[in-house]
């Protein structure tokens, strides 16, 4: 008796080395798919988030591409940079990175911040609430980059932490309190920008309480990757409306 080869959809994610949040959360988000979808991770060194030269050097191209090459050996259907550095370094940084990943590996590539950009454009978001664990220098740069895209940060909350490992130590309820504070300005949406920050478990509850979309970085990356891989993100529930929002962007492929 012969059996067809098993071939679920494999999602590759490039992960900051000191991140301890995105891997377990992403795996939990993919649970409704069972063996239809699996997440696979490759790490490169990221230990601090600041505007220092040493911090910015963590995001130079070659170490990330080397990690992508190793990840590509698992034959993923998509590779995502699951990190938010383009929020302060600029979207062109991620566009160039994703193009380089695809050129090097032959695998479609995307990123957290490109996923945000797509949903913001599709939903016409112009007034944004921003929640991060970052320091003021980073937050200011993020706001300036969004202003250049026609998006105003109408309220923000931050923790003045250079991280990166420490970002994961803040409990979900602390993130929830920050989101609740920012929601008072009634933005079009609230972005929890950091993939090592625990916004995803409280997003659905906060949306119900505030009536405002709460778009967590880990969740939006997972949703975007599912769509690129040909699966329906709307099957994921309990992590906020971002999965249903991403599912509406384009028809889900049937093959």
Which residues fall in each region the model found?
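Hydrophobic alpha-helical
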Residues: 176-209, 221-222
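C-terminal functional extensions of proteins
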Residues: 216-255
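Short, well-structured alpha-helical segments in soluble
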Residues: 60-74, 174-187
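N-terminal glycine-rich anion-binding loop in soluble enzyme alpha/beta folds
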Residues: 1-66, 131-171
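Glycine/small-residue-rich loop that forms an oxyanion/phosphate-binding "nest" at active or ligand-binding sites
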Residues: 68-110
């Amino acid at each position: 008796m012969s059996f067809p080869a098993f071939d679920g959809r494999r999602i590759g994610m490039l992960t900051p080395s000191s991140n301890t949040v995105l891997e377990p959360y992403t795996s939990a988000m993919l649970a409704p798919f069972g063996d239809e979808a699996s997440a696979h991770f490759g790490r490169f060194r990221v230990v601090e988030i600041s505007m220092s030269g040493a911090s910015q050097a963590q995001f130079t191209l070659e170490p990330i591409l080397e990690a992508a090459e190793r990840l590509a050996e698992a034959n993923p259907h998509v590779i995502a940079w699951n990190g938010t550095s383009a929020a302060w370094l600029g979207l062109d940084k991620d566009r160039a990175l994703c193009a380089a990943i695809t050129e090097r590996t032959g695998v479609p590539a995307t990123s957290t911040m490109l996923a945000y950009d797509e949903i913001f454009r599709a939903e016409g978001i112009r007034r944004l609430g921003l929640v991060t664990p970052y320091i003021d220098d980073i937050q200011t740069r993020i706001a300036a980059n969004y202003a250049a895209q026609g998006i105003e940060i109408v309220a923000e909350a931050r923790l003045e932490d250079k991280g990166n490992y420490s970002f994961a130590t803040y409990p979900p309820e602390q993130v929830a309190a920050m989101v609740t504070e920012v929601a008072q300005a009634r933005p079009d949406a609230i972005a929890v920008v950091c993939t090592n920050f625990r916004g995803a478990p409280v997003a659905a509850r906060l949306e119900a309480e505030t009536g405002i979309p709460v778009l967590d970085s880990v969740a939006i990356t997972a949703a975007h990757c599912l769509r690129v891989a040909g699966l329906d993100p709307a099957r994921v529930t309990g992590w906020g409306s971002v999965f249903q929002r991403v599912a509406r962007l384009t028809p889900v492929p049937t093959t």
